Amino acid sequence: MSTYFPSSHDISRKWFVVDASGKTLGRLATEAARVLSGKNSPKYTPFMDMGDHVIVINAEKIRLTGLKSQQKVYRRYTGFPGGLREESFTRLLQRKPEKIVEEAIKGMLPKTKLGRKMASKLNVYKGDQHPHAAQQPQPLEINA
């Protein structure tokens, strides 16, 4: 008996929708990263993109535990001298709540070509509306 190696024809991708209302950021991110990488599938193969699509709605209603909501700082670098930009969690939550959830989930995926391919199947939206109703996404329950 030989080892099973799936081909690209064997992959059937599903769509899942996650409601972030009242969910803890890290717990939601780990579950979403697991589905995006395909580790929830019995046919998981590490060298192939086996993951499903994930839609996260209500990104503005995500929560953090402890004092992280006051202490957490998001940094980015422009590439110029003195170009380190810092923004607090509360400010970024008001301005771009989708960015918070995206960064948390992408940080849990591999930093390779395959990881970027997995991250492209992530869709995060502010509010409870999303344009993917035609794909008939199934709800993904996260106990957070």
UniProtKB/Swiss-Prot annotation:
Pfam families, per the entry: Ribosomal_L13
Recorded superkingdom: Bacteria
Keyword Glycoprotein attributed: no
Keywords of the record: Ribonucleoprotein, Ribosomal protein
GO cellular component: cytosolic large ribosomal subunit
One Gene Ontology MF term: structural constituent of ribosome
BP GO terms, sorted: negative regulation of translation; translation
PROSITE patterns: RIBOSOMAL_L13
Family assignment from sequence similarity: Belongs to the universal ribosomal protein uL13 family.
Family matches, as PANTHER family: LARGE RIBOSOMAL SUBUNIT PROTEIN UL13M, RIBOSOMAL PROTEIN L13
Subunit structure: Part of the 50S ribosomal subunit.
Protein task: This protein is one of the early assembly proteins of the 50S ribosomal subunit, although it is not seen to bind rRNA by itself. It is important during the early stages of 50S assembly.
This protein's name: Large ribosomal subunit protein uL13
Name of the coding gene: rplM
